[in-house]
Amino acid sequence: AWNRRSRSCGGVLRDPPGKIFNSDGPQKDCVWTIKVKPHFHVVIAIPPLNLSCGKEYVELLDGPPGSEIIGKICGGISLVFRSSSNIATIKYLRTSGQRASPFHIYYYADPEGPLPFPYFERQTIIATEKNIP
């Protein structure tokens, strides 16, 4: 079970606010699905990452696994994203032999309604490196 802070490789997270840490274990692909109460949106805050672009990156999806990929992020920027529903997914992917770089990502629940400050919207494409597959 995930309890506000986790170094586990993936899972379903239902208790915002929280903080996700990447796993330094053998897993190459980690998927966290964040579900908040109906009539709320998921807000994801990603500080600047320092991942080895091309070998590891984070994907941000607007909805459950299999939803539209909003962007692939490996470094250079910080961002805040607000989902279009009460579900968002974060994936961490790395190639075999690539040691996991440390990172953390925050998530929150935000009620429906006007945005209190600028968020990256669904149509925003986030890419910090051109060599990400």
From Swiss-Prot:
Residues 73-110 are annotated as: Heparin-binding. Residues 9-110 form the CUB domain. Keywords: Acetylation, Disulfide bond, Fertilization, Secreted. CDD domains: CUB (cd00041). Signal peptide: none annotated. The modification N-acetylalanine is found at residue 1. It comes from the Eukaryota. It holds the Pfam family CUB. It is found in: Secreted. PROSITE patterns: CUB (PS01180), SPERMADHESIN_1 (PS00985), SPERMADHESIN_2 (PS00986). GO terms for cellular component: extracellular region. SUPFAM superfamilies: Spermadhesin, CUB domain. GO terms for biological process: single fertilization. Disulfide bonds join 9-30, 53-74. Its main location: secreted. Mediates the binding of spermatozoa to component(s) of the egg's zona pellucida by a carbohydrate-binding mechanism. It is a secretory component of the male accessory glands being coated to the sperm surface at the time of ejaculation. Belongs to the spermadhesin family. This is Carbohydrate-binding protein AWN. It comes from Equus caballus. The lineage of its organism: Eukaryota, Metazoa, Chordata, Craniata, Vertebrata.
